[in-house]
Design a protein with these regions (language model features):
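Short glycine-rich anion-binding loops that position phosphate/pyrophosphate groups of nucleotides
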Residues: 10-11, 70-73
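Glycine-rich phosphate/diphosphate-binding loop of Rossmann-like nucleotide-binding domains
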Residues: 1-45
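Short glycine-/acidic-enriched loop or helix-start segments at secondary-structure transitions
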Residues: 15, 76-78
């Protein structure tokens, strides 16, 4: 089965951050003999670029896509919005999990971003 890994982030594209996630994921995937990593793609934080790459992969014999990056709480983390748009789905807030996160951050004395959704 063919696998693609998509790493998302402007910081990866411009070289300010090294993409270690896709290497780790690829190493874990090759432990399974029936899976073959056939594509690793880096995409900037752009909804249209994410959707375009996803469309290409889904139409080119890829069985599984692993996506990493763009899932934080800052304004440029738009992976979930891009996926919701691509699959014509709506994002739903899991209130109980959100409350657990808030409690975790409070107990650890970590200030959460106001953009945490």
């Amino acid at each position: 089965m063919n696998v693609a890994i998509v790493s998302i982030g402007d910081e990866l594209m411009n070289g300010f951050t090294t993409d270690t996630n896709s290497s780790w994921i690829a190493r874990k995937i090759v432990e399974y003999q029936s899976l073959d990593v056939v594509s690793k793609v880096t995409v900037k934080d752009d909804i249209d670029d994410i959707k375009c790459n996803l469309d290409y992969l889904l139409n080119n014999n890829i069985d599984y896509i692993f996506i990493t990056g763009g899932l934080g709480s800052t304004h440029d983390d738009i992976t979930k919005e891009a996926l919701a748009d691509y699959f014509n789905s709506e994002l739903v807030l899991n209130s109980s999990y959100y409350l657990r996160l808030k409690k975790y951050f409070k107990n650890k004395k970590i200030k959460s971003k106001s953009t945490l959704k």
